[in-house]
């Protein structure tokens, strides 16, 4: 049986519990806390967030059918919508790893409102998976945010968006050391 007691409390003294005081863990000379993690998440320091969490920050959801624009641009995406209560990093593009049915895939993810193609305020997570061509609508997926690439941008036209997705994909492929 494991018990705990407040240091110096009557229960500790009466039951002769042994109290061990453990120093707080630190990372980069700062005490690890939920506040520290939220601060780092708020500014998109994903590498630090992932170290502090001891796992990658993730968004989980069921794949929904989008407007199919990514497919028309030769960058088909899987789209999920985080709950309104999910604390998220800044809107932007991230190098990500996505798990579908236990299998992992690398890709790039836009977290945000898609300002080039939509005026809607709804936040979505749109992920282009490298070397992937499966129908996963209705499946639960887990998107792990590994590295912040750049802030979300509004492009003058979809051709500019397409060029930037290609550049973001090249960056992420190089980062993940895949062709």
Mark where each language-model region is.
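Generic anion/oxyanion-binding catalytic loop in active/binding sites
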Residues: 1, 26, 38, 85, ...
């Amino acid at each position: 049986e494991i018990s705990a007691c407040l240091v110096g409390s009557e229960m500790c003294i009466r039951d002769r519990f042994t109290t061990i005081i453990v120093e707080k863990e630190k990372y980069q000379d700062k005490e690890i806390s939920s506040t520290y993690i939220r601060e780092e998440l708020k500014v998109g320091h994903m590498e630090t967030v992932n170290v502090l969490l001891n796992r990658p920050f993730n968004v989980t959801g069921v794949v929904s059918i989008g407007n199919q624009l990514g497919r028309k641009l030769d960058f088909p995406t899987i789209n999920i919508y985080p709950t309104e209560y999910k604390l998220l990093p800044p809107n932007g593009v991230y190098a990500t790893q996505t798990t579908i049915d236990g299998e992992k895939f690398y890709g790039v993810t836009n977290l945000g409102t898609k300002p080039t193609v939509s005026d809607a305020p709804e936040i979505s997570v749109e992920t282009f998976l490298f070397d992937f061509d499966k129908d996963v609508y209705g499946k639960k997926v887990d998107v792990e945010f590994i590295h912040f690439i750049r802030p979300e941008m509004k492009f003058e036209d979809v051709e500019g968006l397409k060029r930037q997705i290609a550049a973001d994909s090249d960056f992420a492929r190089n980062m993940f050391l895949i062709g």
